[in-house]
């Protein structure tokens, strides 16, 4: 999608601080971190949100969660714990209409989150 911020980041048109990349997904640090470790993992294919996940594209979501688990171990926060968040739609405060998962770690999280 030509006007999508995350598609432009994935395509290299907009710089990012990359954490991880493979054929299906791209992970990069958040520009306004809400925790000592805060990065986003996005599918390379443009999927608008969790609400747009289908049987045809759900394998990439499973893959993203495998990547999150791998990165949590590599970056050393798997045992302490972390939070994975996806905001959906206007009421959910989704700011970029491209499916993404925030991974937050490095501090105790509070509840309720919003």
Regions found by a protein language model. Name each.
Residues 1-114:
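HIT superfamily nucleotide-processing domains
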């Amino acid at each position: 999608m030509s006007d999508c911020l995350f598609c432009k980041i994935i395509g290299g048109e907009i710089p990012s601080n990359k954490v991880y990349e493979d054929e299906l997904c791209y992970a990069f640090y958040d520009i306004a971190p809400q925790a000592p470790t805060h990065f986003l993992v996005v599918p390379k294919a443009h999927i608008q949100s969790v609400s747009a996940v289908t049987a045809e594209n759900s394998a990439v979501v499973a893959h993203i969660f495998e990547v999150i688990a791998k990165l949590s171990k590599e970056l050393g926060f798997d045992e302490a714990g972390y939070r994975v968040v996806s905001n959906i739609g206007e009421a959910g405060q989704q700011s970029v209409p491209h499916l993404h998962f925030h991974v937050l770690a490095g501090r105790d999280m509070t509840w309720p989150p919003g």
